[in-house]
């Protein structure tokens, strides 16, 4: 929004969507919040149709929805696997597919998928989440090859440990152990991730596609 884009953000509840609309309005930005359950294909189609009618075809898509249902593999239920993969991988494909036609017509597009450091490094107790995020990385490279001739780039941003509500509940011992594995010695800020996403959406990244920007303070280098 700070770069002048019209932003349509989604949330799973009406309250969340209203909060997005309020945030954009207070910032003087164009856009709105909308309710979306990303596992519902009909809702995805309805959302893209609404955006096209009200704002024009999307030129930038940021896939940032994600959930976890952690457990050791031997205890992981099929429903926990399916729910995470449907949300974190299948929905990314569906949303990407929904905007590709408009981007191809415009001969311009930016698809940016937020993955995770664990999709590259792995993490015990998160086989479903790791598989989904690794799948998004592979899919992104495939789409980059498919769509490059139409001036559509597809890239990933892979955050490490970010200072959010999820990490703030850790006790001091857990926090120290986490920081010990990060060469920069601190958690990332949401703004660090946002900056990488904004860069990939900018003209400065026009010749970058099929790659991943790692935002993890050095905890994974590859």
Residue ranges and their predicted role:
Residues 148, 153, 208-210, 216:
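Short, small/polar-rich loop/turn modules that mediate ligand/substrate recognition or access, typified
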Residues 5-19:
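Conserved glycine-rich Rossmann-like NAD(P)H-binding loop of the short-chain dehydrogenase/reductase
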Residues 182-193, 204:
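A conserved structural motif in NAD(P)-dependent oxidoreductases
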Residues 101, 145-149, 206:
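Alpha-helical segment proximal to the catalytic Tyr-Lys
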């Amino acid at each position: 929004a700070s770069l002048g884009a019209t932003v349509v953000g989604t949330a799973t509840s009406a309250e969340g969507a209203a909060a997005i609309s309020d945030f954009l309005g207070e910032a003087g930005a164009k856009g709105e919040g909308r309710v979306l359950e990303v596992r519902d294909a009909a809702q995805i189609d309805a959302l893209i149709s609404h955006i096209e009618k009200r704002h024009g075809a999307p030129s930038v898509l940021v896939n940032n929805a994600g959930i976890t249902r952690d457990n050791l593999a031997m205890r992981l239920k099929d429903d926990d696997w399916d729910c995470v993969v449907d949300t974190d991988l299948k929905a990314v494909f569906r949303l990407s597919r929904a905007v590709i036609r408009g981007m191809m017509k415009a001969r311009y597009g930016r698809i940016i998928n937020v993955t995770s450091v664990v999709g590259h490094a792995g993490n015990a107790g998160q086989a479903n989440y790791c598989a989904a995020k690794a799948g998004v990385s592979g899919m992104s490279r495939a789409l980059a090859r498919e769509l490059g001739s139409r001036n559509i780039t597809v890239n990933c941003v892979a955050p490490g440990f970010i200072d959010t509500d999820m990490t703030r509940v850790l006790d001091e011992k857990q926090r120290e152990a986490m920081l010990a594995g990060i060469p920069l010695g601190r958690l990332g800020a949401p703004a660090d991730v946002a900056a990488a996403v904004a860069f990939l959406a900018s003209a400065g990244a026009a010749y970058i596609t099929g790659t991943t920007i790692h935002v993890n303070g050095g905890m994974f280098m590859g």
